């Protein structure tokens, strides 16, 4: 039950992040893109730039919050997955790329705080 609730909250956070990014003019290229190196939550297009978006949700911030949950190992997995995406979707391989994080902290709904961090880390 807890796992289902956690997965549901994650999907809700992804939907909220997607809406927020689309309201700011980004266009969805892929969602929950899976490969042998992991998963890309959202792949968006911002003008001519391919944006790999990691969505993190934490109900409580006592252990560092959503942003604090992205460590070096997670960043490396995202970079490898992004490389595989660009190899498999060659039409985007010549475009500039960046890694963004959408961090959502707090209970879901109106009380949750969404923080969109552009260029969160370099590859």
UniProtKB/Swiss-Prot annotation:
SUPFAM superfamilies linked: Restriction endonuclease-like
Coiled-coil ranges from the UniProt annotation: none
InterPro entries for the chain: Restrct_endonuc-II-like, tRNA_endonuc-like_dom_sf, UPF0102_YraN-like
A GO term for molecular function: nucleic acid binding
Stated family: Belongs to the UPF0102 family.
Protein name: UPF0102 protein PFL_5073
Originating species: Pseudomonas fluorescens (strain ATCC BAA-477 / NRRL B-23932 / Pf-5)
Taxonomic path: Bacteria, Pseudomonadati, Pseudomonadota, Gammaproteobacteria, Pseudomonadales
């Amino acid at each position: 039950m807890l796992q289902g609730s956690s997965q549901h909250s994650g999907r809700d956070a992804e939907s909220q992040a997607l809406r927020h990014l689309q309201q700011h003019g980004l266009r969805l290229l892929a969602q929950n893109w899976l490969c042998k190196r992991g998963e890309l939550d959202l792949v968006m297009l911002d003008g001519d730039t391919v944006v790999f978006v990691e969505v993190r949700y934490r109900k409580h911030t006592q252990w560092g919050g959503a942003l604090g949950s992205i460590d070096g190992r997670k960043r490396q997995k995202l970079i490898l997955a992004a490389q595989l995406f660009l190899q498999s979707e060659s039409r985007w391989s010549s475009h500039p790329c960046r890694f963004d994080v959408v961090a959502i902290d707090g209970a879901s709904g109106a009380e949750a705080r969404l923080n969109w961090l552009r260029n969160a880390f370099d590859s």
